[in-house]
């Protein structure tokens, strides 16, 4: 098998996957290893989705990003070494993608506003079935990020920023190589996967039960705030005593009303 992170790093040009993943990606997309490793992979990637719409805008100083994407099947946000914000909408079924979605980018002093608007009567339900969104932000120019999206999966990769606030309706969140504070506002039950913890993850929920996976031996402090919130712990699918430490710089916080969070390592249940 090949991890979603490995595929995403190849799809979004944020890095060449580990060598053991290259063969898997090669067979997954029916692309030779030579083509994967050559500079020609950009043209190969275009054929990966039948339809796409790309919008780019030059960035020349650190900005605060306020982005509203509406509905999507999959949403991927990552930092990269370029100097443009790049928003790529892809679909295998919606041939009128370029006409049906308009991406508006406003540059207002220190702020970039991004708004994806559906046109021609396209519904959010259609967007959630047929459209995935890939966003790349230039790493040298990332300040704060606010991002709203309704989607099956949210993936955040290779970001170093003061804070990123996610207003989402999703059941799956992946945080891979993130440094800073991540705030997730979501009232659905979520599975949050952290490949590492370098900063703070704040989860704000009302009447929800979510799970967050962290690597074994991660040093962190767990904090509960709000009303009727609780955190429990699991290792390899078995409930266990709390295994956080006091006064760590890495924090996992649950805030909200009547919500539960399970912090777990190793294999999940089932």
Please state what every model-predicted region is.
Residues 56-60, 76, 98-179, 242-270:
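Right-handed parallel beta-helix
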């Amino acid at each position: 098998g090949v991890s979603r992170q490995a595929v995403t790093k190849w799809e979004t040009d944020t890095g060449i996957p580990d060598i053991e993943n290259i063969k898997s990606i090669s067979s997954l997309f029916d692309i030779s290893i030579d083509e994967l490793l050559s500079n020609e992979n950009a043209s190969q990637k275009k054929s990966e989705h039948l339809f796409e719409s790309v919008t780019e805008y030059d960035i020349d100083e650190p900005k605060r990003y306020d982005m509203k994407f509406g509905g999507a099947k999959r949403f991927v946000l990552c930092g990269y070494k370029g100097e443009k914000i790049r928003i790529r909408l892809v679909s295998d079924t919606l041939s009128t993608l370029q006409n049906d979605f308009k991406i508006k980018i406003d540059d207002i002093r220190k702020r970039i506003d991004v708004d994806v608007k559906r046109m021609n009567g396209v519904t959010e339900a259609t967007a959630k079935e047929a459209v995935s969104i890939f966003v790349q932000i230039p790493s040298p120019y990332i300040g704060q990020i606010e991002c709203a999206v309704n989607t099956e999966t949210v993936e955040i990769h290779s970001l170093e920023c003061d804070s990123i606030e996610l207003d989402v309706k999703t059941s799956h969140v992946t945080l891979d190589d993130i440094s800073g504070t991540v705030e997730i506002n979501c009232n659905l039950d979520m599975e949050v996967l952290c490949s590492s913890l370098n900063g703070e993850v704040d989860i704000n929920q009302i009447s929800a039960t979510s799970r967050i996976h962290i690597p074994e031996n991660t040093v962190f402090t767990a904090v509960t705030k709000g009303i009727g919130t609780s955190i429990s712990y699991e290792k390899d699918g078995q409930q266990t005593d709390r295994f956080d430490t006091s006064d760590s710089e890495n924090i996992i916080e649950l805030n909200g009303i009547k919500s539960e969070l399970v912090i777990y390592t190793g294999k999940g249940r089932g």
